[in-house]
Amino acid sequence: MMDEAITAFLTKHHLLTLCTCKANIPYAASCFYAFMKESATFVIATDVTKTRHGLEAVENEHVAGSVALETKMVGKIQGVQFTGRFREANEAEKKAYLKRFPYAIAMSPELWSIEIQYLKFTNNTLGFGKKLEFFASN
């Protein structure tokens, strides 16, 4: 089970950096996300036939990324780094994304999910360098 401090942080934010890799060449893209607490999953919208990160994630499902609070105050630094598996979103995940971003309904986006396999949360509000980790059970 993911620590409540991590889920609270991820629920509060909405933009992640998705990192993919093809032929040992990394790539990063910013994506809006909805977070599924129960399944430790991010849901994003991307066209896997047109975007570089989408094309690469379909070819190599192993992805990584981050979500960070932008601050200059060291004592307030918070953020996660994660690895996960990219896959098609299920119906519950699609509903969650469209609830979080209702204006996206008009665009009929392709929705995809990232099942978090490992996550490290840095939270300096709990003490300098305080880190919490999550490991998927499968």
Sequence positions of predicted segments:
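A generic structural signal for nonpolar/aromatic side chains embedded in well-ordered alpha-helices
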Residues: 10, 55-57, 97
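Charged, gly/pro-rich active-site loop segments
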Residues: 74-138
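A short mixed-secondary-structure module that forms the rim of ligand-binding clefts
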Residues: 34-72
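Charged, amphipathic alpha-helical segments
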Residues: 1-4, 48-52, 95-97
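A short, Trp-centered hydrophobic/proline-enriched beta-strand micro-motif
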Residues: 8-23, 63-67
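Hydrophobic residues embedded in beta-strands of well-ordered beta-sheets
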Residues: 26, 40-42, 119
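A generic structural signal for short beta-strands and their flanking turns/coil linkers
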Residues: 12-16, 29, 38-40, 59-63, ...
